[in-house]
Regions:
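The feature captures the beta-strand-to-loop junction immediately N-terminal to the Walker
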Residues: 39-41
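Helix-to-loop junction immediately C-terminal to a conserved catalytic motif
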Residues: 54
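Conserved ABC transporter NBD signature motif
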Residues: 62-71, 82, 114-123, 220
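ABC ATPase signature
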Residues: 97, 139, 152-153
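Conserved ABC ATPase signature
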Residues: 135-139, 143
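A short, proline-enriched helix->beta-strand linker immediately N-terminal to the Walker B motif
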Residues: 154-158
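Catalytic Walker B motif of ABC-type/P-loop ATPase nucleotide-binding domains
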Residues: 160-164
Length: 243
């Protein structure tokens, strides 16, 4: 039992089209400083769940609470002001701007903390520290993903939502991104990560949630889910349904 959850999702139902639910009665609890991984077959509703938490998809039923405050369907910028960060799966950096200019966009209403936050991001992503004046479009795929995460960190989030941060990256860059997220978590930031690489996700996370067809299928300590035959069977069943 988590004594003081920083993020609580209570039985939410959400979707993009009226009358069509992608997420159905999903619940999630995240403790301060906890790393939570969300896995599941393609189309399970994982990314939609994150977007619903961050106010990008309308929640039709249920609630989202941040430190006890109801924040259901608040606009994304208000959640950022409440120290929630979000890194989407689709790349959202500005290639014509420099690395530093991209980071400056993320500082939001905390301009006086620029030097402090820049030092924090540079410490988390040393590869970016020597490239602040470089155009973001010249970075590699892995470096651009690190920049996207770094920009989300500029607003000093206490909760960071990551939507498949390893998508489209080489195995080497995937591992670098996973390692960096673990270091970010060690700094005290709670992380909720949706990830297709189920094994690596559960190796990093403290607890895991398994979604299937928009619903909570299983939850528990990440290490136990990693070796749970029911979870393996769910993935194999998903593959069989596609054939």
């Amino acid at each position: 039992m988590i004594d003081e959850p920083v993020l609580t999702v209570n039985e939410i139902t959400a979707g993009y089209t009226p009358g069509v639910d992608v997420v159905r009665s999903c619940s999630l609890v995240v403790g301060q400083g906890e790393y939570v991984g969300i896995i599941g077959p393609n189309g399970a509703g994982k990314s939609t769940l994150l977007k619903a938490i961050f106010g990008l998809v309308r929640v039709r039923e249920g609630s989202v609470q941040l430190r006890g405050e109801t924040v259901t369907n608040l606009p994304a910028h208000e959640l950022v002001a409440r120290r929630v960060g979000f890194v989407p799966q689709v790349e959202n950096i500005f290639p014509s701007l420099t690395v530093e200019e991209n980071l400056r966009i993320g500082i939001y209403q905390r301009r006086r903390q620029w030097d402090e936050r820049l030092a924090f991001v540079a410490g988390m992503f040393p590869v970016l520290a020597s490239r602040f004046r470089q155009r973001a479009g010249l970075l590699s795929g892995g470096e651009r993903q690190m920049l996207a995460i770094g920009r989300a960190l500029m607003s000093e989030p206490s909760v960071l939502l990551l939507d498949e941060p390893s998508a489209g990256l080489s195995p080497l860059n995937q591992e670098l991104v996973f390692e960096r997220t673990a270091e970010i978590n060690k700094s005290g930031i709670s992380i909720v990560m949706v990830e297709q690489n189920a094994q690596r996700c559960l190796e990093i996370a403290h607890r895991g949630y398994v979604l299937d067809q928009g619903r909570n299928a299983y939850t528990g300590p990440a290490g136990e889910l990693l070796h749970d035959p029911k979870v393996v069977e769910l993935y194999l069943g998903s593959l069989a349904r596609k054939q």
